[in-house]
Every structure is written in C-alpha cells, then in structure tokens.
Swiss-Prot record:
Similarity annotation: Belongs to the RNA polymerase alpha chain family.
Alpha C-terminal domain (alpha-CTD): annotated segments: 419-574
Gene3D superfamilies the UniProt entry points to: DNA-directed RNA polymerase, insert domain (2.170.120.12), RNA polymerase, RBP11-like subunit (3.30.1360.10)
GO cellular component entries: chloroplast; DNA-directed RNA polymerase complex; mitochondrion
Compartments, as annotated in UniProt: Plastid, Chloroplast
Region (Alpha N-terminal domain (alpha-NTD)): 1-352
A single BP term in Gene Ontology: DNA-templated transcription
Main function: DNA-dependent RNA polymerase catalyzes the transcription of DNA into RNA using the four ribonucleoside triphosphates as substrates.
Organism: Pelargonium hortorum (Common geranium)
Subunit structure: In plastids the minimal PEP RNA polymerase catalytic core is composed of four subunits: alpha, beta, beta', and beta''. When a (nuclear-encoded) sigma factor is associated with the core the holoenzyme is formed, which can initiate transcription.
Keywords for the protein's UniProt record, in alphabetical order: Chloroplast, DNA-directed RNA polymerase, Nucleotidyltransferase, Plastid, Transcription, Transferase
Protein name: Putative DNA-directed RNA polymerase subunit alpha-like 1
EC number assigned by the record: 2.7.7.6
Higher taxonomy: Eukaryota, Viridiplantae, Streptophyta, Embryophyta, Tracheophyta
GO MF annotations in UniProt: DNA-directed RNA polymerase activity; protein dimerization activity
Length: 574
C-alpha cells in the first residue's frame, strides 16, 4: 500500500445503520510507522470516548411516592421506576453543544396529569435545548394523578457514568445513553519496497445522531486546536544538568480535564518520535562520527496537573517537564512533537475520498433499484406474463414505471450535487495544503536565540490557527448546504417511492395476491381491484392517523407552553 502524497491517508471501509439507533463505522489509516500507529490508536480512542459530547438527562427527582420499595413501583403508573429512568436515559436532546460547554447542570420539568401516556414532548426544557423525537415514551399514567419530575441535564461524554439506585431524598441517577458506545482498534503490518509499514483499523459504534466518520473529524479538529495552543506553552524554567541533559518546564493553562488527559496521552508518544534538530551549516567530521542512529533526544517527560476556579468554572494547568539530550533543546522537542501530532491528525481533514465514495454509493444503490424495476417491466411485457389479467398487468406496469422514473430523477439530482462536493473538496484541500506548509516551516526552524525562535513559532501557530478556523467555517457551511440539498431530494422522492414500494412488497408477499396467480385473467383483475381498494383504505387510515398524531403533538406542545407560562408567573410551583 502506498500513496503519492508522502503522508498517510484514511479510508472508510464500512458504514451502516444498526438496530436501536446505533451506527457502525470501520476505517483504515495507512501507511504508518509503528510509533505513528501507537500514537493514533491511543489518541483517537481517548478523544472519541471523552471528546464527543451530548446533552442527556442524568438525574430525576420524582414527587410521586413509591408504593413498593423492593419492586420500585409508583402509585398509578404502569412502568416500574427502573423502566421510567431507562426511558429518560434514551431521550436524545439536541442543541448547539458549544454553547453549553463548561456550563450547567440545567433543569427540565415534566409536570403532567393522568390518565395519559407521558412523552418527551411534555418535558419543559431550558432555552436552546430540544428533544429529537417528541413521541418517545416515558410512562403510562393509569389513574387521574399528577406525575411530576425534576430532571437534571448535563453535557456528558461516553466516559460519564450515572450512579445506580436511590440517592435518598435527592432522587435517582440516570445512566445516560453515550454518544460513542464502543471504540475498537487493531494494527496490521505489511512490507512495501523493502520497508515495514502498518495499517491502523478503527471501529466506532455510535448512537444516532453521532455519525462515526464525523466523530473522527470532530475529535481531530479538537486535538489540532489544542496542540496549536501547546505550541505556545509558557516556558517557566530551564536548567542544564551533567552529561548534556537539558530540562525545560512548560505550562499550558485554561484546560478542561479531558484536554489535560489528551495532552498527556498523545504528547508522550510524540516526544519519543522526535529526531535530532537540524544544524545550521554542515556537520564537522567529529560531529558526523558521533551521531548514533539509535539516539533518542527526549529522555523523560513528567506531567503535573493543578486545578483552579475561574468565573465559577473549574480549569486545569498542565505543567510539562521535558528532559532532552544535546543537541536537542526541550522547547525544540515540544515544537517538533506538536508538529508531528498536528500532521497525523490533519489526515482526517482530507474528506474528498469519503465524499466521492458517498456519492458513488448513493448512485449505485439507486441504479440497482432502477435496474430491478426495468427487469420487472421487461417480464410484464413478455409472453411470460400472458396469464396475468390485463388490468392487473397495466396497474403493476404503471407502478414499476413510476418507480423507475423516480429512481432516474433521483440519480440525476444526486449527480447535480457533485459540483457542490467538488467545490468543497477544492477549498478544503487547499486549506490542508496551507496547514501542512505551516507545519513544514515549523520543522525547518534552525537553532538560534530562543527569543527569535519564539517569535517564529508564534507566527506559525497563528497561521495554523487561521487555517483551522477557515476549515471549520467551510466545513460547517458546506456540510449544511449539501445536507440541506440531500434532505430536499429525499423529502421530495422518498415518501411516495416508499409508499409504492411497500405496496408492491405487501402485494407480492400477501396470500391473497399469491392466490391471484391461480385464477383466470378476469377473476384476477376483479380480485386485484379489491386488493387495490383495500390498499387505498389503508393509506387513508394511515394518513388520518398521522394527522391525528400531528394534531395531538401540537396540542401537547401548547399545553406544555401554557404550563411553563403559568410557572413563570408564579401560579405553579414544582
């Protein structure tokens, strides 16, 4: 395996929807050295499990009394307390997560009266937070009693664990459904051109709406933003010891707990990948003879964390003590290690291959669907369909022809998305090249006065920050535009197509339809017409039921808003 870019690349091997809103993704990264594989394996796992955040209910204080402490049942409610808490844990909350980082917990209130099926739509939520599925079930209230719950909302990651059982009068903990369920990785070695390389395989199991490939991009952006700050760490102390050992102490401030852990996890591996710095001018014979191919410039890394409070929030200072051996200075090792980390995680900014694969897969699926309908039409037009009634044949032909046209139009519309993808890929590829050019400048900094080096590093760090900000802005805008266009295409075609295809599937598997094949053409047409009539009635009932549900949701929203208004006026208390 190789590429023509002289750096690693990533590929999406498999992405699929599983049951219970779970999403699965499998990815490969190659070519990598053994040390690069180790760094990415540890860093990605840590960042995915702690860096992908979501809003979840974490605690419930229920006013209703339990009638049986052993069974944990609540008077007048069908579900057990354990089931109710699990239902709260499954509710997906949405909002602009960056607005909630470092804030909270927040309070939501469920205040309803039975008999009623309490749903997510009934919960009074703080501004900026919504439930993704309003119809999600919470509890069945079987008697005319109030059901009142005070809920705590927190920003959690996959390592956040709720306590189990009762916490006396304070209420009950809810085990939140994490955004990243599992991260597995494996490494496979191979030989190419007389050299040994490795491929790192990453498997991610996530909870909707967290998409595995976007989770990879998100944590990579977070790590890169973090290490462009590490580049500018405050230099606190420096001393020279015997045998050419240099010790430098640095401090990175205003970190969250998970960021401190990322730096410790990733930086140690990167520091031991650092090579000797470039000399200004040619090496002397004596210097050249003294170079050891196994020489390791970084001798040791010690980390210390100090927590502090600022404006009601808890932050950390991370102190880094780096030991190096001449001629490498501690600050040079830190810069080179940070550059290596930025280079490795920048590979996930290359999304052109993934976007192209996404388009090709959509077109492939719909082209296959189109082919199936063409085949059915061919059979209906052949002598093999002579035993089918004329009306039946015409109706089936019409349905397949309609679906064929829909598939063809959908493929055409998806093809029209390609210029949007191409424009996005062109812009992001250019940004990635700018970023890598800045990293090359960082590696090329020659030995000299620390103050001069520091000015250069600060300038390069600003370039890196600007490139990352430009990428993030472009990604958010274009991702929104492309997603909106894809959703519009889906909205236009999917419902009618799905209705027609589900009708065909039902008919072709229905016992009455199978019996049609045993009838003569006239009887077949009569029976087929009856099946069509029943299908029409079913659709009307489904539409009526759907409209009733919409009306019910609208009514429940109005009732919830009315309760909120009354509570704000002081007419209702929790």
């Amino acid at each position: 395996m190789t590429n023509n870019k002289n750096f690693a690349d990533w590929d999406s091997l498999e992405c699929k929807d599983l049951h219970n809103d779970l999403l699965y993704g499998r990815f490969a990264l190659s070519p990598l050295t053994a040390k690069e594989s180790r760094l990415l394996k540890k860093g990605l796992r840590e960042a995915l499990l702690t860096g992908i955040l979501c809003l979840r209910f974490t605690h419930a204080k229920i006013q209703n009394a339990c009638k049986n402490l052993n069974l944990m049942n609540i008077v007048g409610i069908q579900e057990s307390l354990d089931e109710i808490l699990k239902n709260f844990g499954k509710i997906i909350l949405t909002g602009k997560l960056e607005e909630f980082v470092g804030k909270g917990p927040f309070v939501a209130i469920l205040d309803v009266r039975g008999p009623l099926n309490a749903m997510a739509v009934d919960i009074e939520l703080p501004p900026g937070i919504k439930v993704e599925i309003e119809t999600q079930h919470i509890a069945t209230i079987t008697e005319p009693i109030p059901f009142v719950v005070e809920l705590r909302i927190e920003l959690v990651s996959s390592t956040s664990k709720g306590e189990t059982g009762i916490t006396d009068e304070e209420g009950f903990s809810i085990d939140p459904n994490p955004p990243i369920q599992k991260v597995n990785s494996s490494i496979q070695g191979y030989e190419y051109g007389g050299q040994t390389f490795q491929t790192l395989f990453i498997e991610i199991l996530s909870t909707s709406p967290t998409v595995p490939n976007k989770a990879l991009l998100l944590v990579s952006m977070k790590i890169m933003n973090l290490f462009q700050i590490v580049l500018q760490a405050k230099y606190l102390d420096y001393k020279e010891l015997e045998k050419g050992i240099h010790v430098g102490v640095f401090c990175v401030s205003a970190l969250r707990a998970e960021q401190s852990k990322w730096i410790k996890t990733i930086l140690e591996d990167a520091l031991y990948m650092v090579g000797g710095r470039k000399h200004q001018g040619p090496l002397t014979d004596e210097e050249d003879d003294s170079i050891d191919s196994n020489f390791t410039p970084v001798q040791n890394l010690d980390c210390r964390i100090e927590s502090y409070e600022e404006e009601g929030q808890t932050f950390q200072r991370l102190f880094l003590e780096i030991w190096t051996k001449s001629p490498t200075e501690p600050q040079e090792a830190l810069w080179e290690a940070s550059a290596k980390i930025l280079e490795l995680f920048s590979l996930f900014l290359q999304t052109s291959k993934e976007n192209e694969k996404d388009l090709k897969q959509i077109i492939k699926d719909w082209t296959e669907n189109k082919r199936k309908h063409q085949e059915v039409l061919r059979l209906l037009d052949s002598e093999e369909s002579g035993s089918i009634g004329w009306i039946t044949k015409m109706k089936l032909a019409y349905m397949h022809m309609t679906l064929l046209s829909m598939n063809a139009m959908y493929i055409l519309l998806v093809h029209r998305l390609k210029p949007d993808y191409d424009r996005y890929n062109s812009i992001t590829d250019q940004i990635v090249q700018e970023l890598r050019a800045s990293l090359n400048k960082l590696r090329e900094i020659q030995k000299g006065e620390y103050s001069e080096q520091r000015i250069l590093v600060h300038s390069i760090a600003q370039e890196i920050e600007a490139a990352l900000q430009k990428y993030e802005t472009t990604y958010k805008l274009d991702d929104f535009v492309i997603k909106a266009k894809k959703d519009m295409i889906t909205m236009i075609w999917d419902k009618e197509r799905a209705d027609l295809e589900s009708s065909l599937i039902r008919w072709e598997s229905d016992e009455d339809y199978l019996n049609l094949k045993k009838m003569n053409p006239v009887e077949m047409d009569r029976s087929f017409a009856e099946l069509q009539y029943q299908e029409t009635l079913r659709k009307e009932q489904d539409e009526q039921s759907s409209q009733q549900q919409k009306d019910q949701m609208e009514k429940r929203r109005w009732e919830r808003q009315n309760r909120e208004r009354e509570r704000k006026r002081g007419n209702r208390e929790f």
